[in-house]
């Protein structure tokens, strides 16, 4: 039974280029970027977006420890060239979980797991400037993203 569930997870997440990487104390869903993904955009909750003139950093990989039942500090790691502003260090470090904190990691439904993983990757492909460890000093253009509101 465990074997079938594991195969279902692997088949589902691999459709979007996620893989399982097993280590001593963790089982990580891993997304590898080749070439590394250049992070050139940051946003604030207010809707203001900074488009940087050059990459702030490049993501080589995202690791999500799926042995954690909920996302906490230490669940998401980034492998980067340079330091991602939402990560505690450059190279390889803990990503700030931000709004992902306490979200369930659902292994019983591979589709839900894949949805969460894709949400995580699209989040860290940008910079959440409201909760960054530092603000990039690279020149940027500002644009306003409009938020639709129901009337």
Set out the residue ranges of the language-model regions.
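C-terminal folded domains that constitute the principal catalytic or ligand-binding module
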Residues: 113, 118-133
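Compact alpha/beta protein-protein interaction domains typified by the UBC
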Residues: 1-108, 113, 122
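Charge-rich (especially acidic), low-complexity segments
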Residues: 130-151
């Amino acid at each position: 039974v465990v074997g079938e569930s594991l195969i279902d997870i692997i088949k589902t997440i691999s459709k979007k280029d996620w893989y399982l990487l097993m280590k001593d104390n963790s089982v990580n869903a891993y997304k590898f970027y080749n070439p590394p993904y250049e992070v050139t955009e940051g946003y604030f909750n207010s809707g203001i977006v900074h488009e940087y003139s050059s990459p702030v950093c490049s993501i080589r990989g995202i690791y999500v420890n799926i042995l954690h039942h909920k996302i906490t500090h230490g669940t998401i790691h980034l492998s980067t060239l340079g330091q991602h502003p939402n990560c505690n260090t450059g190279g390889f470090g803990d990503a700030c979980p931000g709004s992902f904190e306490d979200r369930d990691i659902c292994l019983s439904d591979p589709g839900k797991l894949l949805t969460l993983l894709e949400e995580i990757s699209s989040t860290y492909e940008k910079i959440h400037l409201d909760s960054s460890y530092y603000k990039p000093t690279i020149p940027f253009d500002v644009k306003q993203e409009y938020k639709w509101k129901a009337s």
